[in-house]
Amino acid sequence: MRRYARITGTGSYLPPRRLTNHDLAAELAQRGIETSDEWIVERTGIHARHFAAPDVASSDLALEASKKALEAAGCQPQDIDLIIVATSTPDMVFPSTACILQNKLGANGCAAFDVQAVCSGFVYALTVADAMIQSGAASRALVVGSEVFSRILDFNDRTTCVLFGDGAGAVVLEASEQPGILASDLHADGKHVGILCVPGNVSGGQVLGDPLLKMDGQAVFKLAVGVLEKAARATLDKAGLTDADIDWLIPHQANIRIMQSTARKLKLSMDKVVVTVDQHGNTSAASIPLALDHGVRNGQVKPGQTVLLEGVGGGFTWGAVLLKM
């Protein structure tokens, strides 16, 4: 009998500190940087975001989201035999944030590692976990996206610092006799490294290069819309389904314009798109599981529905996962 994987629980966590656009504009004004609620909303659809306290790390946010996902799945940390954390803001250079999370959670002994594909990280991590469960290498996986992007933002650059927030989302993925993950499609193109990156690195005890995020927003937008449509169609083709079979689209919550363009290309109304970017901002690898959990807990996303997850991020990376809840 073929072995499949399905999501049995979701969870998410946002740090308590919430900054509206007005709050952020006031803080930036002290640096001599001008912006406004109107300017941010018009270009991004973002109204607010959450920032973690200075002593809070990605693993701390991941821990809270994981606890909620485990509770929703009705299992204990000791029941998990695989932990994958998608993050581009790890606690340390090494070991992995997954290992740190494992210890905080009390799930010691299982396999644990990080996946780094920036904002595409969660769809990459979910695809890897699905493959490991299908192969028999794992039976119950905890897949997490967690970020503290506030640590790598250049608050002198209003075109980027207004976009991002901190948060975490998690799912429990279990072996199943019935398909849950229906298909996936992952890609990358390294020639676009420079359009979204943090170019600095640690060497000899020093940070060499710029340690803050750099982005060519127009280049990212143009590339993202095209590759997201292709990934969606490839994933649907693999599953033998069409646009009409999608109950919910949960894209990476980067920018409302990218999300609207993707929905149009897939002939979906925005009523079928789970949107959290307005209140969370862009939380990178955390954005998709955060939005999924939001949709589940507010009653939008229901058992048996077909959901398309899509991510796009630095690298340049992109991908999609089609699943049945």
Curated annotation (Swiss-Prot):
Pathway: Lipid metabolism; fatty acid biosynthesis. Residues 253-257 are annotated as: ACP-binding. Pfam families: ACP_syn_III, ACP_syn_III_C. Keywords: Acyltransferase, Cytoplasm, Fatty acid biosynthesis, Fatty acid metabolism, Lipid biosynthesis, Lipid metabolism, Multifunctional enzyme, Transferase. It catalyses: malonyl-[ACP] + acetyl-CoA + H(+) = 3-oxobutanoyl-[ACP] + CO2 + CoA. It comes from the Bacteria. Its main location: cytoplasm. One of its GO terms (cellular component) is cytoplasm. The active site is at C119, H252, N282. One of its GO terms (biological process) is fatty acid biosynthetic process. It is an enzyme of class 2 (transferase). It is found in: Cytoplasm. GO terms for molecular function: 3-oxoacyl-[acyl-carrier-protein] synthase activity; beta-ketoacyl-acyl-carrier-protein synthase III activity. Gene3D superfamilies: 3.40.47.10. Its EC number is 2.3.1.180. InterPro entries: ACP_syn_III_C, ACP_syn_III_N, FabH, Thiolase-like. The last Arg residue of the ACP-binding site is essential for the weak association between ACP/AcpP and FabH. Homodimer. NCBIfam families: fabH, PRK09352.1. Belongs to the thiolase-like superfamily. FabH family. Catalyzes the condensation reaction of fatty acid synthesis by the addition to an acyl acceptor of two carbons from malonyl-ACP. Catalyzes the first condensation reaction which initiates fatty acid synthesis and may therefore play a role in governing the total rate of fatty acid production. Possesses both acetoacetyl-ACP synthase and acetyl transacylase activities. Its substrate specificity determines the biosynthesis of branched-chain and/or straight-chain of fatty acids. This is Beta-ketoacyl-[acyl-carrier-protein] synthase III. It comes from Delftia acidovorans (strain DSM 14801 / SPH-1).
